[in-house]
Amino acid sequence: MMRLDKYLAERTGMTRSESRKAITKGRVMVAGKICRKADTQLDETAAQIALDGAPLAGEYKKYVYIMLNKPEGVVSASRDKRDTTVVDLVAADYPRRELFPAGRLDKTSTGFVLLTDDGALAHDILAPAHHVDKQYLVTLDTPLTEEMRRGFAAGVTPADGEHLAPAEAEPAGDDPCTVRVTLHQGVYHQIKRMFGVYDAGVNTLRRLSIGGVALDETLAPGEYRELTEEERKQLQN
């Protein structure tokens, strides 16, 4: 259940104050009858609401799931005092949503960032116990070696003493410095720390997929779209 003023704000882009004024002025109809009470409780999945005589367009979405192709120089956060955030890039289209990134990429990294307001799904994606695979395209400052591949497969322990879980590092194309990395559970700076064990530096890092959902290659850096129903179900499963 949801208050009428909150529902109207989310559906129209109004502020809560604007939606309350519209309701008290008799501009809003619920199930064909004028309603002037902003605190009226609705079943948001089945509500029949009209504003100024016109039914609200589209359907109500309890949560949204957005695939963003993160460009370099943007931070993976909901808000930041100095830098542009991934949420800033989509905010104009989702003004009343409290979005956050389900997982982070460094400021210099690029690729697939999932933005949502579904905390349960984000937890499932990020929880180490759930082992949601994430795939990356990495360029190193030195060629990939068999020692690195074996080390990734077994898991490594950097100088800080934290054991990093097994992952996969495989050649990606003809360039020996270009590597496809698959993480089965992610921790802070895992890829850079794992390659650091072999004195290999990461020049670029681009996330290609999350949980089997691949970045839409038609999205230019900074562009985004909502997940399809099939993609959303794939993440939830």
What positions do the PLM features span?
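Basic, flexible Lys/Arg- and Gly-enriched helix-loop patches that mediate nucleic-acid binding at interfaces
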Residues: 2-237
